């Protein structure tokens, strides 16, 4: 880029889980590191990796599966840190829609997806469960999966527990229906992945920018770590500061989404090696990565100790599901303490 300003592209319009990035800006943490950051919003979320990979933008956010696929398609990007770790992701639907926990109940239904790789996931899952392409209708929804379910444009769609599922729960509450009528068929279980890490939201860099500016990236991540620590230490105070800067998020839905995102925030920012191995394997299974593909992530720009990975990731997922259900019922800010 021809400017000293670092450009950073969000993966979507500002959401509750973008709070560390904006607070690093408003609280002066970037400035403390001698950085000038321009935070940008995409018109189309599908453009993010292409814009960063082509060098039009320096850094940004994207899910793990998209980060892997971007480099495989000739857009050189690398993950340097994690923002949101393993949010539960799956096929969302409403009770009474004719869909059940039996995946084959999706036969004859309209299934929504965000972008290209969501369609690939649906096709692979339906094939795995003995369905043909003509047995369902795939509908590209962008980030409007919950909206399309509510408007009956689709019967089900791929979404995240702490975002689109909360949106469905809020809709149900206004209809006088229990929030538990919002259901999810988790993709990690359907696809036998053992983790929801393919939708881990990452801080990514253009490779050339990373090569030329290693110290700037280190300083950027120091500022992000300080902001993340601030959010985790006092989430209510942090939220008040965030909505003062982003008043469009000052509503019940956004606050509840923030509560549900809280347990997923990566406190260390470290890329989890085991998750990358699993998702790289999943990408090869989906045929979006070549057989010899090498994962494009690094932790070398994080200047604090790396935590130990959990010894039993399946048990961690089970406990997180219980934790998130309790959060839904009680509306509290709590982190899940997992054994190493």
From Swiss-Prot:
Motif window: CCCFC: 195-199
Residues that, per the record, bind pyridoxal 5'-phosphate: 115-118
Active site (catalytic residues): 66
N6-(pyridoxal phosphate)lysine modifications at: 62
Superkingdom, taxonomy of origin: Eukaryota
EC number per UniProt: 2.-.-.-
Reaction equations catalysed: N(6)-(pyridoxal phosphate)-L-lysyl-[4-amino-5-hydroxymethyl-2-methylpyrimidine phosphate synthase] + L-histidyl-[4-amino-5-hydroxymethyl-2-methylpyrimidine phosphate synthase] + 2 Fe(3+) + 4 H2O = L-lysyl-[4-amino-5-hydroxymethyl-2-methylpyrimidine phosphate synthase] + (2S)-2-amino-5-hydroxy-4-oxopentanoyl-[4-amino-5-hydroxymethyl-2-methylpyrimidine phosphate synthase] + 4-amino-2-methyl-5-(phosphooxymethyl)pyrimidine + 3-oxopropanoate + 2 Fe(2+) + 2 H(+)
Pathway assigned to this chain's UniProt record: Cofactor biosynthesis; thiamine diphosphate biosynthesis
Record-level GO BP terms: thiamine biosynthetic process; thiamine diphosphate biosynthetic process
Required co-factors: Fe cation
Pfam families according to UniProt: NMT1
EC top class, as a word: transferase
A GO molecular-function annotation: metal ion binding
Protein family (similarity comment): Belongs to the NMT1/THI5 family.
Quaternary organization: Homodimer.
Annotated function: Responsible for the formation of the pyrimidine heterocycle in the thiamine biosynthesis pathway. Catalyzes the formation of hydroxymethylpyrimidine phosphate (HMP-P) from histidine and pyridoxal phosphate (PLP). The protein uses PLP and the active site histidine to form HMP-P, generating an inactive enzyme. The enzyme can only undergo a single turnover, which suggests it is a suicide enzyme.
PANTHER family named among the record's database cross-references: 4-AMINO-5-HYDROXYMETHYL-2-METHYLPYRIMIDINE PHOSPHATE SYNTHASE THI11-RELATED
Miscellaneous field: Present with 752 molecules/cell in log phase SD medium.
Protein name, per record: 4-amino-5-hydroxymethyl-2-methylpyrimidine phosphate synthase THI11
Natural source organism: Saccharomyces cerevisiae (strain ATCC 204508 / S288c) (Baker's yeast)
Origin organism lineage: Eukaryota, Fungi, Dikarya, Ascomycota, Saccharomycotina
